[in-house]
């Protein structure tokens, strides 16, 4: 069965194991998520559990949103997402960090930091041209392709907007779970800025 929870990225730090090993970790705060709806094949065409995370003021919600969360007897939520392959939950139930344990392997999804309009060197990692005085280019994208088609092919790597994409990092290890603080420590870095929404769920490609 899949485990899943929504949280917010707090930042990065490091911890030391009992053997003295140094581990860089990302701190993710995941207050209890509330189950707002249980979707079934009969009513919705697929099975999923809809959860809400992070309370917001009622004045910021419209009537349909208030009525939706009222079925779960909870406050309006800022973020609402779905998890599949989660069974045995009813509307109003809570998902907490206690479902995870140290050593679990998870996939972490977030929105990468936006970098604005960037060139091909920063955006795609291309090499720059010769920097000598007589060089005809330094940081330009290079050849646009052969003469024959008289056009630029699709997917040609060019300058453009960078970042702000939905990114999933797979097979990250949970180093520690702190239930009293609703905190999960994940080994390594995860996409997104501080305070951004993070989705944690069981890894789909974990070694069995």
UniProtKB/Swiss-Prot annotation:
Keyword Ribosomal protein: yes
Keywords assigned: Ribonucleoprotein, Ribosomal protein, RNA-binding, rRNA-binding
InterPro entries (alphabetical): Ribosomal_uL3, Ribosomal_uL3_bac/org-type, Ribosomal_uL3_CS, Transl_B-barrel_sf
Positions of region (Disordered): 116-148
Gene3D superfamilies assigned to the protein according to its UniProt record, in alphabetical order: 3.30.160.810, Translation factors
GO molecular function, one term: rRNA binding
GO cellular component annotations of the record: cytosolic large ribosomal subunit
Domain of life, per lineage: Bacteria
SUPFAM superfamilies per record: Translation proteins
Biological process annotations from GO: translation
Family: Belongs to the universal ribosomal protein uL3 family.
Subunit annotation: Part of the 50S ribosomal subunit. Forms a cluster with proteins L14 and L19.
HAMAP family hit by this protein: Ribosomal_uL3_B (MF_01325_B)
Function: One of the primary rRNA binding proteins, it binds directly near the 3'-end of the 23S rRNA, where it nucleates assembly of the 50S subunit.
Entry protein name: Large ribosomal subunit protein uL3
Species: Streptococcus pyogenes serotype M5 (strain Manfredo)
Upper lineage: Bacteria, Bacillati, Bacillota, Bacilli, Lactobacillales
């Amino acid at each position: 069965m899949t485990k899943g929870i929504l949280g917010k990225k707090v930042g990065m730090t490091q911890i030391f194991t009992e053997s003295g090993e140094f581990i860089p970790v990302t701190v993710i705060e995941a207050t209890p998520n509330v189950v707002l709806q249980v979707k079934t094949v009969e009513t919705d065409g697929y099975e999923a559990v809809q959860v809400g995370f992070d309370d917001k003021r009622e004045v910021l919600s419209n009537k349909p949103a208030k009525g939706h969360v009222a079925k779960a007897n909870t406050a309006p939520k800022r973020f609402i997402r779905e998890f599949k392959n989660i069974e045995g939950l009813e509307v109003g139930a809570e998902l907490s960090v206690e479902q995870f344990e140290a050593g679990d392997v998870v996939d972490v999804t977030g929105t990468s930091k936006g970098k604005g309009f960037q060139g091909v060197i920063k955006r795609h990692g291309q090499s720059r041209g010769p920097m000598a005085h007589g060089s005809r280019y330094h940081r330009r994208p290079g050849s646009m392709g052969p003469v024959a088609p008289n056009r630029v092919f699709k997917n040609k790597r060019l300058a453009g907007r960078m970042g702000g994409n939905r990114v999933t990092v797979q097979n990250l290890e949970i180093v520690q779970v702190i239930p009293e603080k609703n905190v999960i420590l994940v080994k390594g870095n995860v996409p997104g800025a501080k305070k951004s929404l993070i989705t944690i769920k069981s890894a789909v490609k974990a070694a069995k």
